[in-house]
């Protein structure tokens, strides 16, 4: 790993010292500035989900579209909502409620048999936001899939050579934050044309606090 753990620990310590107390739990965000990448080439743009070692927040909101046994098993977990076919049809006729659901939900999972209906009813809202559901077979281990999605973050590089994503919260142990940050670095190394050489700089910050540079 090109980035030493000590450098990440140092930056985390600095932002926690600099950050003022707020009346809410601040997130910790990683900001990467890239270089020498031609974003006019579609293959160089990034829009994907990265699985972190630890959930970056406690309240990841997951909505599941399912019927039958899959819906029953989903309701036994701590997902945000479980909606069936009738609810989907109702949402299709109410754009206001559809937009509210999409804005309130971090990730969507959907039984494979409902994907076509979802595409017709919610696709125009989900698609532009990058929130199209992950298809789930009716017999899939929904609990395992939900646990995995609670650890996911979306990273995007589209029009500018910079990306920002949440890697945890200010009350997380430093060691957990370090592991999550390293997971992002590892994925970008794999994904960028020249690997780590395409990363110009890295910073971390809390939601409302100043940033601190990670020495690369």
What residue ranges belong to the model's regions?
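Intrinsically disordered, compositionally biased charged tails
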Residues: 1-6, 216
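Long, charge-patterned amphipathic alpha-helical coiled-coil/hairpin "stalk" segments used as oligomerization
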Residues: 83-187
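Interdomain regulatory linker/hinge segments that flank or connect interaction modules
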Residues: 10-18
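Residue-level signature of catalytic and energy-coupling elements of molecular machines
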Residues: 11, 74, 127, 204
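A structural signal for small-residue-enriched, beta-sheet-centric alpha/beta enzyme cores
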Residues: 160, 164, 207-212
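Translation machinery proteins
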Residues: 18-72, 93-97
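Flexible glycine-/small-residue-rich
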Residues: 66, 167-169, 206-208, 216
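Flexible, glycine/charged-enriched surface loops at secondary-structure junctions
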Residues: 22-27, 191-202
